[in-house]
């Protein structure tokens, strides 16, 4: 009896897909199933074993590398209580055949560069993530060999691997005396904006060639400013790289910004750093702490913090938490003004901190000494006479 091809994940997500192809012995074929997981180390919107809804699979005959089916879409079935994925058209095992299944998500037409999929590898030439952080995508690939004899009951175990590095940036503050308004974020001077990917379906290992890459800045301007006020009933922490994850960046090594003040003798070292578009105000007081020329809560300037490591590895998620309880970083070493035509940060002018300098100095404090009271000896008053005793002797009456 013919059985439709479908995919099922017992513990996580099913992640394969198929298009209809001829079979040599459909009378004895059984259902093809998959039990798949997404690698734990993982954007924009990261893909996990829990949230994956769609996947696309290509299948090849292991014997000659010819295609059995290409780019079949599977969608997670609803209302079943299981992670079962239903294909757009059924597919069947062929007795005696061994297949190479290659799965990707999202669909190849939505990748920055559409991948080329063969039995032995997946390749993408000059793949460059979008420069707007929330437009970036988490890209995953997985491959496995399977036969009906070994997998017609329990399904095929298939693991999908993240091929990018994820950079998640979040902030926190428990200082209820300062209000921070954050309008945007940048990851500045990332070393390589693109690379050529080669993913081996034999060992599920990815390699990146970054020779053609150039420096790039990734950014995101928020629809509404994020306000941190440090109060128990207010907002004390927030994610800046999108609610569903972080920036998705080509894995690479890089030189971090050295965090030093920029001068003619010590110029900016061209390193990578994180920058926030920020407005800072003390709760008590009428002036703004940053930018120096702020005219209200809608005046912003860029502040910076150095990235604390020098490498982002494939499949790793890096979470940077910026604690702003006692400070907000340094003046951006390159472009501190939101609008250079109407500068309000004015680094190094009228006593303002220069590029690369701390925005907050040390906490203002005082070493207090109270002058002791002077206590001249005025004698004692004799209440019987209303006179003052001098040297403990009764005063003479006038």
For each predicted feature, which ranges?
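Sec-type signal peptide cleavage vicinity
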Residues: 2-398
């Amino acid at each position: 009896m013919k059985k439709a091809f479908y995919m099922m994940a017992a513990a996580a997500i099913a992640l394969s897909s198929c298009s209809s192809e001829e079979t040599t012995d459909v009378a004895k074929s059984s259902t093809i199933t998959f039990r798949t997981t997404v690698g734990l180390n993982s954007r924009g919107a990261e893909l996990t074993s829990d949230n994956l809804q769609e996947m696309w699979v290509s299948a090849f005959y292991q014997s000659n590398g010819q295609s059995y089916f290409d780019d079949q879409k599977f969608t997670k079935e609803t209302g079943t209580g299981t992670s079962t994925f239903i294909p757009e058209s059924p597919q069947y095992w062929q007795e005696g055949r061994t297949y190479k299944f290659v799965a990707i998500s999202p669909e190849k037409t939505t990748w920055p560069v559409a991948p080329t999929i063969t039995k032995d590898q997946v390749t993408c030439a000059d793949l460059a993530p979008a420069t707007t952080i929330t437009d970036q995508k988490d890209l995953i690939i997985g491959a496995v060999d399977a036969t009906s004899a070994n997998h017609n009951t329990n399904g095929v175990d298939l693991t999908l691997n993240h091929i990018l590095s994820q950079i998640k940036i979040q902030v926190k503050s428990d200082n209820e005396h300062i209000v921070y308004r954050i309008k945007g974020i940048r990851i500045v001077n990332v070393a390589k904006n693109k690379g050529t990917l080669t993913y081996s379906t034999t060992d599920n290992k990815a390699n990146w060639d970054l020779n053609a890459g150039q420096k790039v800045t990734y950014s995101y301007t928020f629809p509404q400013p994020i306000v941190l006020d440090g109060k128990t009933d207010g907002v004390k922490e927030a994610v800046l790289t999108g609610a569903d994850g972080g920036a998705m960046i080509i894995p690479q090594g890089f030189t971090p910004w050295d965090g030093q003040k920029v001068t003619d003798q010590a110029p900016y070292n061209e390193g990578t750093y994180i920058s926030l578009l920020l407005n800072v105000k003390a709760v008590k007081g009428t002036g703004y702490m940053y930018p120096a020329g702020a005219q209200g809560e809608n005046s912003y300037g860029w502040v910076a913090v150095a990235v604390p490591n020098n490498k982002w590895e494939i499949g790793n998620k890096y979470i940077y938490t910026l604690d702003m309880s006692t400070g907000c970083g340094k003046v951006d070493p390159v472009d501190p003004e939101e609008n250079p035509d109407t500068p309000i940060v004015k680094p190094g002018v009228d006593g303002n901190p220069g590029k690369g300098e701390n925005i907050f100095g040390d906490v203002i404090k005082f070493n207090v000494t109270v002058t002791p009271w002077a206590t001249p000896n005025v004698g004692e008053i004799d209440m019987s006479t209303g006179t003052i005793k001098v040297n403990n002797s009764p005063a003479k009456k006038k």
